[in-house]
Amino acid sequence: MKPTTISLLQKCKQEKKRFATITAYDFSFAKLFAEEGINVMLVGDSLGMTVQGHDSTLPVTVDDIAYHTRAVRRGAPHCLLLSDLPFMAYATPEQAFENAAAVMRAGANMVKIEGGAWLVDTVKMLTERAVPVCGHLGLTPQSVNVFGGYKVQGRGDAGQILLDDALALEAAGIQLLVLECVPVELAKRVTDALTIPVIGIGAGNVTDGQILVMHDAFGITGGHIPKFAKNFLSEAGDMRAAVRQYIADVESGVYPGEEHSFH
């Protein structure tokens, strides 16, 4: 089996073929996801909440991400694997490069960082040194204390700022962008404006791809359930069928529906 590359996702965007991605944190689930057809996975700092039981992503360390990256890579050797750089792991370009190198050595193909135009120098530093970068705009969970909670971003005048940030990051060299919890109308503007693939979560069905936290897809999230989440396991009956249903619904545009979207 050939490894999945960013070129495949670029081709999907050009051909307007939606693609499904998911978070993964261990060998067994990564193997299951790969076997059922998911070719792109994210070792997200969401593991701080879903795996470690914290109330935010802030306690997650680079060592945590590297540990889970190694496990996922063993389970899905051919997937395109993205790994988060966690809170305060990229305060300077030099720090970002050191920590990105550790995560790449663990098996990541690309690192994801949260933030806007202030990250331009960091993105350039990484890409010039052969570290592919995925950006993340909108609701960026590492900034939860600044936002005052998990709220929809990019409404009103903030939408233009977000679009400008996306264009600046693309010009700096990011190869993917995650858009989280933004109005559908803004998600479409960003997706149309960028030449790189855009992956949405809580951004409607207008982005090139979708991502879900695996616990949300299986309905095993404790506490608050995000509006954009859907429990595919309740309809499918078993985990493998749930993954296949998730992929099919993303590719057809059925998911996310209006009930999962913001305006």
Swiss-Prot record:
Organism: Enterobacter sp. (strain 638)
Keyword field contains Metal-binding: yes
CDD domains (UniProt xref): KPHMT-like
NCBIfam families: panB, PRK00311.1
Gene Ontology BP, a term: pantothenate biosynthetic process
Residues annotated to bind Mg(2+): D45, D84, E114
The protein's required cofactors: Mg(2+)
One Pfam family linked to the record: Pantoate_transf
Family statement: Belongs to the PanB family.
PANTHER family the UniProt entry points to: 3-METHYL-2-OXOBUTANOATE HYDROXYMETHYLTRANSFERASE
Pathways per UniProt: Cofactor biosynthesis; (R)-pantothenate biosynthesis; (R)-pantoate from 3-methyl-2-oxobutanoate: step 1/2
Catalysed reaction equations from the record: 3-methyl-2-oxobutanoate + (6R)-5,10-methylene-5,6,7,8-tetrahydrofolate + H2O = 2-dehydropantoate + (6S)-5,6,7,8-tetrahydrofolate
Function: Catalyzes the reversible reaction in which hydroxymethyl group from 5,10-methylenetetrahydrofolate is transferred onto alpha-ketoisovalerate to form ketopantoate.
Name of this chain's protein: 3-methyl-2-oxobutanoate hydroxymethyltransferase
Enzyme Commission numbers on file: 2.1.2.11
Protein localization: Cytoplasm
Enzyme class: transferase
Superkingdom of the source species: Bacteria
Binding note for cofactor: Binds 1 Mg(2+) ion per subunit.
